[in-house]
A protein has these predicted regions:
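Conserved core of the PLP fold type I
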Residues: 61-196, 214, 221-226
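Conserved Walker B
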Residues: 91, 209-211, 328
Length: 329
């Protein structure tokens, strides 16, 4: 069993790194702590590095079409880590989850239609809706401080959720599961309630589950499409190795759509963009990550939990009160 050194400090400045170099270009101090972007300062797993080295040494980076090994790595990962049995034909590749969100908005709504989100949420949700001339409708999450427990909790206002769907004739809901940035890991019961409402009103759900592998002990990620077979029929599930394995710059994501009609509509929008084959090295890294990255991820999550516990204790001492969340958003 390999032991990974997450204490190693790697200087990313001056490497065209968006996280650090962008801040300096915008006039921020050179020593600024860039907490605004979700990539990590850890090197990737040995399995990924070795696979990329082999691909680079081959010396040709032509058009790429992943085969069975790629799809098997992904489906096996989903079954092992998320108790979700999937099929190869459900998987559609895009260069990123935000790209997929845009394709879904165009595939399943028309200009002027309303799209439902749950603020406070990852800001590209709003941008991608407005940039495609759709209307943003907000089912704002309800925030509750539990002072005696030193915790905070966001919850869903289901009455408002259904009311907005009816009043605004919602056709598409973009779910963030787990929720970024509030860190809620939605329970099966919460997702069941959302799903029943969407089923009742024929609302398509696009579930952004890119943070599905970052859940703290005591919590369990539930794939929305796996809550109920009926929900799978109207769900687009967005996943990627980018957050889990620190691969954002390799531009690859895997979108699961079990309903053939939805899949064809989504593919039509992808075709309109001219996107076809994935990034050659991105495909290699994705397969390697899902095939052999479990040990690295297990050690990473333990390390991140130690960081969280340190930060919690430090802020509790200095600020006297701290509210924590379920996931590492």
């Amino acid at each position: 069993m390999a032991t990974y050194n997450f204490d190693k400090i790697i200087n990313r400045k001056g490497t065209n790194c968006l996280k650090y170099d962008y801040a300096v270009e915008r006039g921020k101090p050179a020593d600024v702590l860039p907490l605004w972007v979700a990539d990590m300062d850890f090197t990737v797993s040995e399995e990924i590095t070795k696979s990329l080295h082999a691909a680079v040494d081959h010396g040709i980076y032509g058009y790429t079409q992943p085969k069975d090994a790629y799809y098997n790595a992904i489906t096996n990962w989903m079954e092992k880590n998320h108790n979700w049995k999937t099929k190869r034909e459900w998987i559609m590749k895009t260069p990123g989850v935000v790209f997929a969100l845009g394709a879904a908005v165009k595939a399943f709504t028309k200009p002027g239609d309303a799209v439902l989100i749950q603020n406070p949420v990852y800001y590209p949700f709003t941008n991608i809706i407005r940039d495609n001339d759709r209307r943003v409708i907000d089912n704002t999450l309800v925030y509750e401080k539990r002072v005696t427990e030193g915790k905070s909790q966001y919850s869903i206002d289901y009455e408002d959720f259904e009311r907005k769907i009816v009043q605004e004739h919602i056709k598409l809901f973009i779910l963030c599961n787990p929720h970024n940035p509030v860190g809620r890991v939605w329970t099966r019961e919460e997702l069941q309630q959302l799903g029943e409402i969407c089923l009742r009103h024929h609302v398509i759900v696009v579930s952004d589950e890119i943070h599905n592998d970052f859940v703290y002990p005591g919590f369990e990620h539930t794939v929305f499409a796996n809550v109920d077979p009926r929900f799978a029929e109207f769900t687009v599930t967005c996943t990627a190795p980018s957050k889990t394995f620190n691969l954002a710059g390799l531009q690859i994501s895997n979108i699961f759509i079990s309903n053939e009609t939805l899949r064809e509509a989504f593919q039509k929008e992808i075709d309109k963009t001219g996107y076809d084959e994935p990034n050659a090295l991105g495909a290699v890294a994705c397969e390697a990550a899902y095939r052999g990255g479990q040990e690295w991820l297990d050690q990473l999550r333990a390390y991140l939990l130690e960081n969280l516990n340190f930060l919690r204790a430090y802020l509790q001492e200095k600020l006297c009160l701290l509210y924590t969340s379920d996931a590492a958003d």
